[in-house]
A protein has these predicted regions:
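Extracytoplasmic "Venus flytrap"/periplasmic binding protein-like
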Residues: 54, 58-125, 158-167, 274
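Hinge/lid segment of periplasmic solute-binding proteins
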Residues: 94-151, 173, 324-353
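Extracytoplasmic/periplasmic substrate-recognition and gating elements
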Residues: 139, 295-403
Length: 494
């Protein structure tokens, strides 16, 4: 099996090399022609195709050429070719940071102010993105991102009334039971054999961050750094923290009785189409859902319910879930803290408020980068400056009716008055800094494609029809520990 995989990989690389030999490389290329390679994911690329056309029409010095693929791995494999690589600029996800040191710095793009605008590109970015992309060693930017997509729990508005939306995970559990009692299937999501668990990792990571707090999540868990500053710390990776608490929530709400039979399907298109036809009330997905399926289904995304076990981390550890929910309601209503309004301390209020704003934003993983050996680097930067100007951002927003990763310098250019409820919700969520993957995370995670759950199956473990195959949260956690035990030496000995 390993031999055949190697041969397949070698053949793929040979094919890419053949394509490169037919085109340009960094030694003989036209420095004024920008070869762009872009990943076509759920957002499509109509917006980028239009921006490329507009850029080419706007000036005569440079020419941008766009090539696309629905397979991010195919795109990234071109980086194996080094200076024989034909591409100058990428819009894609990255499985690992194997090639990161060969990416050019893009700080001068961020410091640029487009003509007629009052802010630099850097000043236009929504909160969190630049923090996630800043190099932890030298503070420079070798990665930027495109888009502004969040992932969370989606609900069918015809099956779940807005007044019944859960503010806590205990309330989410009650909602799942109530739906079942009404003969409505609560959950339908797809089975991804990779590390995302049918997008559930986005929600479970949010719950983990809610429980432990963002400081712990970013500065200890994701950096694998202990309280003494030692990193990588295996003890931190194995600590039974908010990740375990998230698994306990999932164990409660995901069962054979609460899930659609198609939850075992690995075909996300089939599952999403069934969901959008009303086959279940809830799913886990992201901003791209309606665009990817060309649907106008009556759905919306809820704020991620606050994990009820957060009370274990509060000063008031005896706070009831009803009290927690009421505090969250007041926060949602925009009520400022005072002792008469809130039945909790200021510290607990701040902790709960932070948790309420946590929703996973995966656009920080949709990267823009340029190889530093490209002789069209100046041209690529000229394109990026154009890409982040208001007219290009407006193209993105008008095409998708979703927020971009940067705000318009002139907000009045976009008319969202006729946007759907779905779009308006997602524009609202963009105002809060999302939970994001950062370049400062531990090389154990960053360079080996390992996530906070060590890549183990979570959601699928709880819904197996055969009782002998079904696992509980403790068994999934034991599997996580086993994966860490098996991989730790390879991850840390480089």
């Amino acid at each position: 099996m390993k031999k055949s995989l190697f041969v397949s990989s070698a053949m793929a690389l040979l094919a890419i090399a053949s394509l490169a030999s037919c085109g340009k490389n960094t030694q003989d290329a036209d420095p004024n022609t920008i070869q762009i390679y872009a990943w076509e994911s759920g957002l499509g690329l109509d917006w980028l195709k239009q921006t490329v056309a507009d850029f080419n029409a706007s000036q005569s010095e440079y020419t941008a050429v766009l090539e696309t693929s629905t397979n991010a791995s195919t795109i990234i494999k071109t980086l194996d070719l080094g200076t024989s690589n034909a591409y100058d600029l990428y819009f894609s996800s990255l499985g690992t940071f194997q090639y990161y040191d060969s990416f050019a710095t893009l700080d001068d793009v961020l410091e640029y102010k487009n003509e007629g605008e009052s802010k630099t590109i850097k000043e236009k970015f929504y909160p969190g993105f630049l923090d996630s992309e800043r190099d932890p060693d030298d503070g420079k930017y070798r990665l930027l991102n495109y888009g502004n997509t969040v992932a969370g729990i989606v609900y069918n508005c015809d099956l779940v009334d807005e007044k019944d939306l859960p503010r806590t995970t205990d309330e989410l559990s009650n909602l799942v039971l109530e739906l079942g009692n009404k003969k409505i299937t609560p959950w339908l999501f797809y089975n991804e054999p990779g590390g995302l668990n049918g997008y559930w990792n986005y929600v479970s990571s949010a719950w983990a961050a809610q429980y432990d707090g963002l400081d712990y999540y970013y500065n200890h868990l994701m950096t694998l750094k202990d309280d003494s500053g030692n990193t990588p710390s295996r003890a931190v990776f194995e600590k039974k923290d908010g990740r375990y608490k998230a698994l306990k929530v999932m164990e409660d709400i995901i069962t054979p009785n609460t899930t659609h039979s198609q939850c075992t399907s690995t075909n996300f298109t089939t599952v999403q189409n069934l969901y959008l036809k009303g086959q279940a009330a809830l799913t886990v997905n992201g901003s791209w859902l309606l665009n990817e399926n060309k649907s106008t289904a009556n759905i919306n995304m809820m704020k991620t319910p606050v994990i009820s076990s957060i009370v274990e981390k509060l000063e008031d550890t005896k706070m009831t879930d009803e009290e927690l929910s009421e505090i969250i309601k007041n926060i949602d209503d925009g009520k400022a803290y005072d002792a008469d309004t809130y039945s909790c301390s200021l510290n607990d209020y701040n902790r709960i408020k932070e948790a309420r704003t946590v929703i996973y934003n995966n656009s920080a993983e949709q990267y823009i980068f340029a190889p530093n050996y490209s002789n069209a680097l100046d041209a690529s930067k000229a394109f990026l400056k154009y890409f982040f100007k208001d007219s290009s951002i407006l193209t993105y927003m008008n095409t998708l009716h979703l927020p971009s990763n940067v705000r318009l310098d002139n907000a009045s250019l976009y008319d969202g008055s006729n946007d759907s409820k779905w779009s308006k919700t997602l524009f609202g969520m963009a105002e809060n800094e999302g939970l994001m993957v950062r370049t400062s995370r531990s090389p154990v995670l960053r360079d080996h494609g390992v996530n906070a759950f060590a890549g183990v199956q979570t959601a699928q473990s709880f819904l197996a029809g055969n009782p002998s195959d079904r696992k509980n949260a403790d068994q999934v956690w034991d599997e996580l520990l086993a994966v860490i035990d098996e991989g730790w030496e390879a991850w840390t000995n480089e």
